[in-house]
């Protein structure tokens, strides 16, 4: 762990941001316990801000807590990856069913995220944060708050899966940019079939990049 110095942010926020980035980069297959003392030293804070950050991360699904043992990051198995991507396919393809009524402004918002991702290609955590933002925007465009909340519940697992995919030395980031562009082009052309095909291709490529089959 690389020790950091707190900035103008509050100490709980410093601890939270550092731990979220650290967790996103962990091997997804491994269970990792988090030591409050080590985290306090590494983030340049103290145990109280670390505990506050852990409670926030627990609420968001990034960590789990065991009484008398502390917090840990649960593993994400290959079957988990497949199940998550299958769920995403159902939700995302439903969400774009209203493509004909999407405004140019909505579609322009997708393009802006792609442009930001292009600038963040060398920062896997930021790149995947933007990736999640891209897909969340797509789901929200569907106008179903229940599905949007369900999709949001997958956020922490999507971050870890995505960071793993773009950190393996291949040009997965470049592939993602091209795949996202195909989705946006389909939306701009108001073609539901093309949008569905682009979403399926994108999620299939993600699965292959992460688990290899």
Q: What residue ranges belong to the model's regions?
A:
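Short linear motifs at protein or domain termini
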Residues: 1-101, 207, 212
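Amphipathic alpha-helical repeat elements characteristic of tetratricopeptide repeat
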Residues: 13, 78, 89, 107-111, ...
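Hydrophobic packing residues in well-ordered alpha-helices of helical domains and bundles
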Residues: 84, 110, 127, 131, ...
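Hydrophobic, amphipathic alpha-helical faces that serve as interaction scaffolds
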Residues: 87-102, 132-170
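Amphipathic coiled-coil alpha-helices
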Residues: 91, 113, 120-123, 130-133, ...
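Amphipathic alpha-helical dimerization/coiled-coil segments
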Residues: 92-126
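C-terminal all-alpha effector/ligand-binding and dimerization domain
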Residues: 118-119, 164-213
């Amino acid at each position: 762990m690389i020790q950091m110095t707190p900035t103008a942010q509050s100490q709980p926020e410093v601890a939270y941001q550092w731990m979220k980035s650290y967790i996103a980069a962990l091997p997804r297959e491994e269970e990792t316990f988090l030591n409050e003392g080590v985290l306090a030293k590494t983030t340049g804070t103290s145990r109280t801000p670390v505990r506050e950050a852990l409670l926030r991360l627990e609420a968001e699904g990034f960590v789990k807590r065991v009484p008398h043992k502390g917090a840990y990051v649960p593993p994400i198995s290959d079957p988990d990856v497949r199940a998550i991507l299958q769920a995403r396919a159902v939700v995302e393809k439903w969400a774009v069913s209203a493509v004909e009524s999407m405004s140019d402004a909505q579609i322009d918002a997708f393009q802006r995220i792609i442009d930001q991702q292009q600038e963040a290609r060398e920062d896997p955590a930021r790149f995947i944060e933007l990736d999640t933002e891209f897909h969340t925007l797509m789901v929200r465009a569907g106008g179903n708050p229940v599905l949007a909340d369900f999709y949001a519940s997958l956020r922490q697992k999507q971050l870890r899966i995505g960071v793993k995919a773009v950190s393996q030395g291949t040009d997965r980031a470049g592939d993602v940019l091209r795949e996202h562009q195909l989705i946006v082009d389909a939306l701009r052309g108001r073609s539901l079939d093309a949008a569905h095909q682009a979403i399926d291709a994108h999620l299939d490529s993600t699965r292959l990049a992460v688990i290899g089959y």
